[in-house]
Amino acid sequence: MVKYKTYVLKRMNMPFTIAFVKNTFDGTLIEALNQVIDEIDKYLKKVEEKFSPFLPDSLVSRHTDLGEALQENFFDLEYQEVYSRSIFVKEETKGLFNPFFEGKYNPTGFVKGWAIETAFMKYIKPLIDNNIIEAGAINGAGDMQVGTSLDSDFSWEIGIENPEDREKIIARYSIKNGAVATSGINKKGNHIKSENDIEHIQVTVIGRYLSDVDVMATVGIVSNKNVWSEFVEKNKLTGILLTKERIKRVFEEGKITDVERT
């Protein structure tokens, strides 16, 4: 029977839960994992220092104050990656996902998923690939990137909460490698906009990379039924959403099915 070793970090005003799975955890392994956790914590701290709109000295906060002046820090590779991908996402979603709300650059809606995915690929995946652990995951406020060794039978069992009753589960997914992101009305931020009435109260999307599915879940909240259906079919999305009309809408590889919510 496998065992779990979990850690919780607090960064970006939210908890990050890191979980490791293996049959046994000896002292040497635990010491090594403690060092990995320290590295992840340092990395998330750097991400926060670069991208937090609440820190006056962050690169994001200084982004619109530079005018035509260029500073070396803004050539930071991660900053450039997030900026370029945020612009791309805005175009791909026809502005439903917008990192320039109120006229200022703020990629908060993209950064969390991207940071979790990046930290996973940088610190957790090598442990899995080298059979140091059997499986690993990083979960940030319900959005997660998970992985499992190719020769392992272990799967991550992920329950999707009912937004109206957090003690109930509306769906369960068994995943070895991939990402899960959930967006809801209560999580809706100013980095997204909608010209339509909100029809979906919660959207969960499952895929390969968290930076992608996190954006898609956000778009699902602000899209009307027709726009979202086209988006699901075009991108062959998998997941589940709840509508205000008490409909549970399941989509798998772009195919959509409505089920009355009980």
Language-model region placement:
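Mature catalytic core of soluble alpha/beta enzymes
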Residues: M1-T262
